[in-house]
Regions:
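Long, K/E/R/D-enriched contiguous segments that form extended
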Residues: 310-341, 410, 463-469, 474, ...
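Active-site recognition of the HExxH zinc-binding catalytic motif
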Residues: 264, 392-412, 434, 439, ...
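Post-HEXXH active-site segment of zinc metalloproteases
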Residues: 411-435
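Catalytic zinc-binding patch centered on the HExxH motif and its immediate surroundings
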Residues: 327-329, 362-384
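A well-structured
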Residues: 21-324, 335, 506, 613-616
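Short pre-active-site segment immediately N-terminal to the catalytic Zn-binding motif
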Residues: 327-329, 382-401
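Bacterial N-terminal signal peptides
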Residues: 7-17
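C-terminal, non-catalytic "cap/extension" segments appended to globular domains
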Residues: 23-24, 33-37, 41, 125, ...
Length: 618
């Protein structure tokens, strides 16, 4: 699968589970007819793609015959990619509407096959462009000014010369793409479909099957004994499959190490970062700063323990809210609040978002067999973004709405500003758009809060967001760096070994030996629960994104000159520039300590506000 397509669908593949129950009216469903009126339309377009792939093969060995032919071949490649993204979006979203229907599964499988054929058909492009060399490519661009839209795309290929194989080698890698995805497929099948989930009885007599959805719901119960029962049952079941999940993750790590070696990178991390020309200083600085500021995370845990009335904080005390809330946020109200919160981004932004919310872009409510989680798919260039939600009328659902619409507006602005080949953006900037909108929402909610009790709800949520998005993702990134480095060096890893490595990091981040949060050994299997580890070095970008988003949101809200325009220019730029340089040019250098120090200062400031409110009540 092409790099640009991986980027387009990462959010889809990595959606985190939310609650799934209830039924929604038809008006709250997305309109896939904007993609294709019916499956026959999809079938026809799939046939067109097959023919275009054959036509594209005619470009092999002939790219440089003339400037005009060079441009035509690049245009055909772009058209092939654009058509495939639309086909794949319809197939995957049809499957997600009801994951039990064979028709949806079949369509998704057909789209996967098309993806493999596309990989094979386009595999000649990179080695042939590299064979031309930079001077020849520049001459072709100069001779045909209309080809300038491909300048960045071509530069991204040319800079990878030392890491690209010859045509036959690239064809082999493309052909083996599907075969080497078995680790993730096995993991997903077991974790999502075949795990024999345990059943527990809660203190009120309720019997619960503790699957992933139930775990995420019941881990936040107010009754501490119930939380422990849920935790123990859930993680004990994962522990039973420690060896199996150890095999699947180790196979994934071996695949990543092999690809890095084949492409002549020193290690897996170097290859992952080079995909978007990210300096390793970004990764290293994030982890250094996260570890340096663990006392702030520990301060949060101590505050949480005090507010929950606990003499000892345990891992199953992480999730219950510090402040209870009965406030409801149905989708209509949530949409109004979201639209009000983004007013600092300007009238055009608000108007476009408002139109999208009532134009069939969203599938809003949970229902049986609908895919859990939330994602935005903005890969259908000629249509519009789509959002899958599982809205439960709570504050978390409101923040998820703001998050996913941040992604959607990023796609909307990018598509309006860039040609197709430059419209898709990397994860490094994608999550900035979503987290910035979350932070704007928080600011708005704090401003309209009726009293300190309501304000505490939002401050509590903000703290948990910082824990989960900055510190927790940095912790995952530390684990990834460790296990990849071991396999890159030729070490073998078992499930037991992975549990030990993860457990040590988990305990360090939570201050286990310092008595901050006690981590029971049974919970150190948590690594097996995280699907992100099958997409190498992805999660660190959540932490860098909330860091950058906090700075952008602060500057925009404080009406710093040009702050809004610099931020919107990141969204409009799409994938037309390398992301680190793009964000740096807007004023945030994520390879330096300052942005991370600012996000930690923000977390401390929120805790200060909570303690001031607490002091009032004494």
């Amino acid at each position: 699968m092409t790099q640009i397509f991986r980027i387009a669908l990462l959010g889809l593949a990595l959606a985190l589970p939310l609650l799934a129950s209830g039924v929604e009216p038809e008006a709250d469903r997305w309109n896939l007819k904007d993609l294709y009126p019916s499956q026959p339309g999809w079938d026809k377009d799939a046939g067109t793609l097959e023919q275009e792939l054959k036509d594209l093969s005619g470009c092999a060995g002939r790219l440089a015959q003339s400037p005009a032919r060079f441009k035509r071949c690049l245009d055909l490649n772009a058209e092939v990619l654009k058509r495939f993204y639309r086909l794949y979006g319809y197939a995957s979203q049809s499957r997600d509407e009801d994951t039990s229907l064979p028709s949806g599964q079949n369509l998704k499988q057909r789209a996967d096959v098309l993806g493999t054929r596309l990989e094979e058909a386009t595999s000649f492009l990179r080695p042939e462009i590299l064979g031309l060399g930079r001077s020849k490519v520049n001459a072709l661009l100069k001779a045909n000014k209309s080809a300038a839209i491909y300048a960045h795309w071509l530069d991204d290929i040319l800079r990878s010369a030392s890491h690209t194989l010859d045509r036959r080698g690239e064809e082999l890698i493309a052909s083996f793409g599907a075969a080497t995805s078995a680790a993730e497929a096995v993991y997903s099948t077991l974790a999502d479909a075949e795990m024999p989930w345990p059943k527990v009885r809660l203190s009120d007599g309720t019997e619960v099957v503790v699957d992933q959805t139930a775990y995420e719901k019941y881990r936040a119960l107010g009754n501490r004994s119930d939380r422990k029962i849920v935790f123990d049952a859930f993680w004990s079941k994962w522990r039973e499959f420690e060896r199996t999940f150890g095999v699947t993750l180790y196979e994934q790590l071996k695949k990543d190490a092999a690809l890095a070696k084949i492409r002549r990178y020193p290690d897996s991390l170097a290859q992952a970062l080079d995909a978007n020309r990210l300096p390793q200083a970004v990764y290293d600085t994030l982890l250094t700063q996260a570890e340096l500021h663990l006392p702030t995370l520990h301060r949060y845990f101590k505050l949480r323990a005090r507010m929950l009335g606990l003499s000892e904080m345990r891992y199953y005390d992480i999730y219950p809210p510090m402040v209870s809330s009965n406030l409801k946020y149905p989708i209509g109200l949530s949409t109004e609040l979201m639209l009000a919160s983004v007013k600092p981004l300007g009238e055009d932004y608000v108007r476009a978002m408002a139109q999208g919310t009532k134009s069939g872009w969203m599938d809003v409510y949970p229902r049986p067999r609908k895919r859990s989680g939330a994602y935005m798919n903005g890969s259908a260039y000629d249509v519009h973004p789509y959002l899958l939600l599982n809205h439960n009328d709570d504050y978390e659902s409101l923040t998820t709405l703001a998050h996913e619409w941040g992604h959607a507006m990023h796609s909307y602005l990018s598509i309006r500003s860039q040609p197709f080949i430059n419209a898709e953006y990397p994860t490094f900037t994608a999550e900035i758009a979503s987290t910035t909108n979350e932070l704007l929402l928080l600011d708005h909610m704090l401003k309209i809060a009726q009293d300190d009790s309501e304000r505490m709800i939002y401050l509590d949520s903000a703290l948990e967001n910082l824990r989960g998005t900055f510190f927790r993702q940095a912790m995952f990134a530390a684990f990834e760096r460790d296990i990849h480095a071991r396999v890159d060096k030729g070490e073998s890893l078992t499930g037991e070994a992975l549990t030990k490595i993860y457990g040590d990091i988990l305990k360090r981040y939570h201050g286990d030996t310092q008595g901050v949060v006690k981590i029971d050994e049974i919970y150190t299997i948590e690594w097996a629960f995280i699907p992100h580890f099958y997409n190498r070095f992805y999660v660190f970008q959540y932490a860098t994104s909330i860091t950058a988003g906090a700075m952008f949101a602060s500057e925009i809200l404080n009406e710093k000159p040009l702050a809004r325009e610099r931020y919107l220019n990141i969204l409009r730029a799409g994938g037309s520039r390398y992301p680190y340089e793009l964000v740096k040019a807007a004023g945030v250098d994520l390879a330096t300590a300052a942005p991370y120090q600012a996000i930690v200062a923000r977390m401390n400031s929120i805790m200060d506000q909570i303690e001031v409110i607490q002091a009032k009540g004494k």
